[in-house]
Amino acid sequence: MGNDPRLPSPSASPARADFWARDRAASGVPTPVFRGRPVVYVAPGELMATTLARAARTLLGSCVAVCLWDGNLRIGGMTHYLLPDSNGHPDVTPRYGDVAVAVLLERLHRLGARVERLEAKIFGGARVLPVFPGDGARVGDKNIALARDIVGRARIPIRGEDVGGDRGRKLIFCTDDGSAWVRRL
């Protein structure tokens, strides 16, 4: 997967793993449950990928969540990024969409997923922040465009999206069946 030209460069992937959403249920800590699945909260700048049945939950404003799912293996993951791309920023973390999606693809690959079996769902990107100086584009719009671009270049079909607008969203994505629930706030 590392040499697949359809995917973002793995060199953008950070070496640290402290951006992982903590799965409290895996450590035996009591946790909320959604439709029989332990809930894992994915905070801004975090991501998760798992072979376990989990309900990944997050809140989105201008941020975007890219959810990927492999239906054959019934595994999936979610990113929650704040800004579209790192643009050479020295702090290369999944707060940036280009890094977040590349790391999620890499982690899912390590769990056995294959890019040709993946399906994507994209959420968020509301217009709740001011425009970028100079180009007049809004953060949410740029986040949406980046998600569509990366997923499109990887030839991963987008099976659902709820993006844009002027309201935030509460999102729950089930990693074992690829289903998602969205509520606008």
Q: Where do the protein language model's features map onto the residues?
A:
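Active-site microenvironment for binding and transforming phosphate-containing groups
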Residues: 1-185
